[in-house]
Amino acid sequence: VADLQEAVGTRENPIAIPGICGIKIFMGVSTGTLLVSDKTALERIFTETAGLIAVHAEDEDRMAERRKLIEGRTDIAAHAYYRDDITALMATKLSVELAHKTGHRLHILHLTSGIEADYLNDHCTLPSMADGYPIITTEVLPQHLTFDETDVDEHGVRLQMNPPIRYAKDREILWQRLVDGTIQCIATDHAPHTLEAKSKGFPEAPSGMPGVETSLPVMLNYVNQGRCSIEDVTRWMSTNVADC
């Protein structure tokens, strides 16, 4: 915690090192060994630091148990099965609980499931519209607004990412919650890998997809299809991002 305080400050002295906008916490393993899953450690970070906390919300203990259920499987469907929506919801609920307990600013990264989006309907708002604390915001990726299990079945590990591409029902609820304002922003979680690395197949292939260069064209396609307006895209990818 001391290193984090030096980087982002404390409640009493909220001065961050220039260029550091906050703390990202992996509540479940995704990239390398980056992980803070212990509730006591998480509460210390929420209590003793300043600035924004952004969380990759997957419950590590549940994920570890469910990983045992797919031992020996090489089909890509196993990825979303063991990193399921309850795994994500548990971590999202914990982060919201800690934000309410401490009053800390919270941003929940790359929302993927319908049950999370519905749960956050009562918790998220733009900072400029907030009436008190905590201020909680969230985001969604074009990948999760576009793909579902049929695409994963067709394209395999090229669509493998964490948290995973889920199901058509999740995609539709994410759209609903983006339009109604529960979700404030469009992000990308840009994490490209070579085709050589992806060719290893599941579960050895790395998780991650490109996103920066495709995000705006994908969203403009939705404008052309009538799913949203250009003003919506401007809010989700520009003004709301600045607000957050």
Feature map (PLM): residue ranges:
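His/Asp/Glu-enriched, well-ordered alpha-helical/loop segment
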Residues: T74-G103, R158, V179-D180, C185-I186, ...
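Histidine/acidic residue-rich metal-binding segments in metalloenzymes
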Residues: A2-I186
